Amino acid sequence: MRRNPISNEEVFWNPQESKIDLDALAGVDAIIHLAGAGVGDKRWTKRYKSEILNSRLLGTTTIANAVNELKPKVFISSSAIGWYGETGNRAVTESDRGGDDFLAAVCREWEAAADLVSGVRTVKIRTGLVLEPTGGALGRMLPLFRFGLGGKLGNGKQWWSWITLHDELRAIEFILENQ
């Protein structure tokens, strides 16, 4: 989906105005929502933190409303490991209480927006950093490290779970094919 589709395979949407081309999505078996402003793309000013939150809430709410009308077999909505907050080396599970920092609050609201869906199997995937050499966090870091300019991330003591793009796509495929 794009605000300005450039091919017939792309569907118009504008989450800021809660608009989406329902006709173009009619008859789909699944809707997968992964969009949101990148948490590593810019400095976290008050304005950008608002963009991080609103891009997820407006997008997910717009799509949840579409899912409620279209009734596909499954709706997959991204969330993030930020749900748990800083946990150090403690393993976490889906039943663990969320954290209390900014990203945890974003994830709570993000998942609540996905909960607006009713009557459709809904899966919220709490993903770690998706690593791909040509994009995302790793794509931005590799050039710096190759030139000897890389350094520790954050305070260097935090734990981040990560997944390769290939494995992330396989996980989504598994969700689509299994209950």
Indicate where each model-derived feature is located:
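Glycine-rich "substrate-gating" loop/helix at the edge of Rossmann-like oxidoreductase active sites
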Residues: G98-D101, R126-G135, N155-I163
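Glycine/proline-rich active-site loop of Rossmann-fold NAD(P)-dependent oxidoreductases
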Residues: V120, V130-R140, F174-Q179
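Conserved beta-loop-beta element that borders a ligand/cofactor-binding pocket
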Residues: S79-A80, A112-P133
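Glycine-rich NAD(P)-binding loop of the Rossmann-fold in SDR/ketoreductase-type enzymes
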Residues: E51-G59, G98-A105, E109, I163
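Alpha-helical substrate-binding/gating segment
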Residues: L142-G150, Q158-Q179
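Conserved Rossmann-fold NAD(P)-dependent oxidoreductase catalytic core, especially the SDR/UDP-sugar
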Residues: T61-D101
